[in-house]
Structures are given as structure tokens and as C-alpha cells.
Amino acid sequence: MKKLLILASTLMLMVLSCGNSGSESKSSGNAGTGSKKYRIGITQIVSHPALDSAREGFKAAFKEAGVNAEFDEKNANGETTNSNLIANNFVSSKEDLIFAIATNAAQSASQATNDIPVVFAAITDPQSAGILKNNVTGVSDRMDVKQQLELLKKIAPNTKNVGVIYNSSEQNSKIQVEDLKKAAKELGLNIVEKSVVQANEIPQAVDNLVREADAIYLPTDNLVASVVSLITEKATAAKKIVFGAEAAHVKGGALITQGVSYYEIGKEAGKMAIEILKNGKKPSEIKFKTMPLSEIEVNEKTLAALGISLPEDVKSKAKMIQ
């Protein structure tokens, strides 16, 4: 029976490696010959542009620093059971470090080991996620949402009702909505919430928001990220502004963001990992951090479709995306 369980676990991990967005399960960072090669397990809860960018940013940090590393990349395809299996396998194979992308992946890694260093990325509130231990640190994607709302008011000063769509079963999203409501109250704005738990609920929720809100905010939510284009197409057709929490939303058709860069989040997490592996720092000596807001990004096609003009002080700072 034990042999069968081991075989089943091995087969499952082979499947998870194959489903890694077309990338191979193992890749190497560039470094000088003869240098120590670190073995790093990368666990990602699901594949979408933001989380994929964090993964690539993490690997880029090693390449830029000339640190030799072999990355064993696994994707849980949205399943916590898979995430637990991946984390336990990394512990069994005695990886030098685990990089965990998003809350579920980090929770699995944190629970699986007290000894192997774990560096996380793309978690809004690591404290409430229960992952902070002596062997865990990383980079949060929590941001100053008030600054996002102030940007919205600059480009659409008559905005009164701001809609938000989010997955109510995702703790990160609920925290972001609470932050949004607090900031909106300070700015005299009203928040219209639509929560969903499955992707097939989103079209109806967006239709309702388009009727009830003047603009729509997209948080960093894994479910929302999977259907950004659907949301932005419906909103743009109704001449409603969509502003996003991160750059991938703008690439998916949202008008504007001044959010976080997941590539830079991943790169910062990579720098932390290098401090731990190469320079001997303990994770407990590196406090988890948040990142400053990135540059303003605007979708040029959406701007034209909405028929609006940006104020000069916004336009002069904005990076236009085709």
C-alpha cells in the first residue's frame, strides 16, 4: 500500500510539472563556473500573468546577481491539495529554499517545514494568513489603495460610486475590499460590492456593476485575474472606467493603474532569497516588506474607446500601453 501511495504522489507531481504554463519544471540561473548551485523549489498556486511575472522576477534576481541556481517549478493548478503535495515533496527532496507564490502556496510551504527557508510573494496580509514563522519572510502585494482612488478622481472627478468585484472566499481580496472601503470613505466615495466564488458568476456581477457604478476597481484577486478581458470589455462597452491594482489588468483592457509590479515583487523576493542562501542571513532577520506603487500605466486603446482625455499632470507621468 505504501509503495502505491508513493507512486501516486510521484505521478501527481509529474502532472503538476507538465501543467506549468508551458515552462519546463526545472531551469537554471546563469552564474560563473564552479560556484555552488542552489536548489530552489518554486510553488505557484495558479498560473495567470501577475503570478507568472512574480516567478520570472524572482529568477531574474538570481541571473542578475550571478548566483547559480536550479529552479524546480511546480503549479498547483488552483488546488490546495496539490499545493500541500508540492510543498511536502520539496521538503522531502531537501531543497535549499522554497519560493511560494500566493497565499495558499505559502501556507502549504509554511506548514510543511520549520527548517527550510521559505520566501513568499503576492500575499496581501501574511500576518492574517498565518504564515509568519522564523523560517519565513517575503514580499507582500498590499498597496496604498487611497492613492489609486485619488488617481481615479483626477481623471473622472464626477465619480461617486465605485464598483468592486472580488472572490469572497479569497482572504487577500476581502482585506483589499476593506482597505478600499476605508479609503473611499475618506474621499467621499461610495463602494458598490459584488462578490463571487466562481468564474461563471462574474458576467452577471459585472452587468450589475455597470448599471450601479460609475467606475470599477479590480483588486489583485486570482479569480478576477482569470477573466480580466471579459470584465473590461463589458465595462468599456458601457463607457465605464476600469482601474486595476496592477499592470496585468491594464494589459487586459483596464484603463489605468498605479498599482504594484509583480515582476518587481518577485525580484525583491529573489534578492531576499540570495541574502539567505549566499550571505547566510536567517529569514527571521529579514522583515517582510511591501513595495512602493509603480508608475502610472494607461491602455491607449481603452482610452480611445472611452473617449476621455487625461489631465496633463497624469498624462505626463503615464506609460502608454498598446
Residue ranges and their predicted role:
Residues 11-12:
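Repetitive helical segments and hydrophobic/amphipathic motifs
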Residues 2-8:
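Sec-dependent signal peptide recognition
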